[in-house]
Amino acid sequence: MNRNLHHIITTIITVFISVTLYAAHTNAERLSLLQPLIQYDLAFNTGVTTDSIILWEKLLTPELEKQQRYDILFQLKAMAVQSSITEGNISLAIDNANSMYKKAKEIDYPLGTALALRAIGNTYLSSSTPQVAIGSYEEAIEIMQQIPEADIYLKNALSQMILIKLNNRQMAGIEKDINYLEALCDKRPDSPCYFYLPCCRAFYEIQSDKLPSALEHLQKMERIYAKHPYPYFLLLIKYLYASYHIAAKEYTQALQSYDELLPYVKESGSYKDIQISQERAKVL
């Protein structure tokens, strides 16, 4: 089972869905389209392509720096790094993540440093060095824990780290990590970010071969998605259902989950569609 799931978490973090390019002519329009991503620290949203994010980061940076809107600036820079990863331009992503880290240090902005470390972790993950990626996430989490307004980023970074550890069978201390995530999520149970808790629990139960419990958490994910229909959530649901069906030896259903997912991935232009197709082929 683990071979079939080897790249799932990497793909979850790096693939974007983007189906429509909006013609945003002003920075205000661009920020408006990016608002759902900024507000909930989401990896992507329909209507904003990876190319748009990379371009808009360049266009918006001077104005955001002038206004000292570092909270938006560094999140946008992190999005641009992620977009480069999604397009397969890992070297550019690494350069931009390191530049982001240097900038945050220069202006002494801890949240920017934490977001840069998380972005660096994403580049390591895409370079198939998960252990180094985990180290970057741990550094980011340590900084975020000291920043009250970093709560949403802390949940995201922690859930990413948990998923990577699970994918690499690093089970030591994983329950402690999940319990910590639960304590964070319980502060705002109505927030869309609560989605990440059943997501991590579902994958943990799949890896632990506790499939009935895994299914319950998958169903919780679906209920949250019904209230907060963000495309990123749907992507995670499809991936984890595929892994659930593989673990349950329900290969027809696993293929169906992949088939429902692939059109979105191909439409996004992500280089990951080939990888997902290869994983699907292993199920045949």
Stretches with model-predicted labels:
Residues 8-9, 219:
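Compositionally biased, intrinsically disordered low-complexity segments enriched
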Residues 1-7:
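Positively charged n-region of N-terminal signal peptides that target proteins for export
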Residues 21-284:
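A "functional boundary" signal
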Residues 9-20:
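Bacterial N-terminal signal peptides
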